[in-house]
Amino acid sequence: GYFVIFMMDGIDDMPSENEPVYITGVGTEDDGDEAEAQQMLRQNEGIYQTFTQLKADQPFIFMSTVEGRKCYYYVDDNGVLRERNDGEDYTVTVPQSGIYRITINMGEQTISYDEIGAVYLFNKSGDYRQNFNYLGYGKWGVKNYTARKQTESWAGSGETRHSFKMEINGTTYRWGHKEKDKGQPNLTTDNSYYNLYQLALGTDPWDYSFRFCDELLQWGEKQGNVYYATVKTDVTLYFNAEFGTYTHRWVASETNED
């Protein structure tokens, strides 16, 4: 007798840890120039994520170089992530232009899309928000920003706790610190302090917050119940692979020298 082994058409060329995966194509921010392709953040073995802007009905593809060979990955009509064979030109499209968070799982051959709306800095104190602009390639930011902190009964010198908010599929999520109640940073604090973690819905709005760096911002005199920074800053959120993790940075704006 004989038996037949049926195998699912899996992905043969799985990129290793040091073989980056990119999103590229006319539908992406690189306009089809693979040299400008956006690298995805590797979250785990076979799992990659990117925040990026896509154009409706324009093709894109996932790409990696595995053991020296250029490999492309697409999504078939059943929503299954597959590897393109030589000579094939399958691509992927989305029906609506927008900014998306895309997650692919090569082991399970799945893809998910989340639509991203407003992104902003949020101070629970005073319920103050500062909207951020999308800068491209998974970055959001604001330039020449004057930080503010408001006095509270428990914080006479101003409450510096803040986090970042992001609308994902119409629901607002907070991104905050890894620790529930982390102290204030200074100019020599390790950059890992600024790494961003998506918090569960319903998390206490004060917990897992960042705190302002007084050494950088140089607070002025109190005006009413608010202190304003005398040093303007450029604040950038990196929802990309640039630092190997989602993170953010505050730097003094060039305009301060005027």
What are these regions (language model features)?
Residues 1-258:
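Insoluble glucan recognition modules
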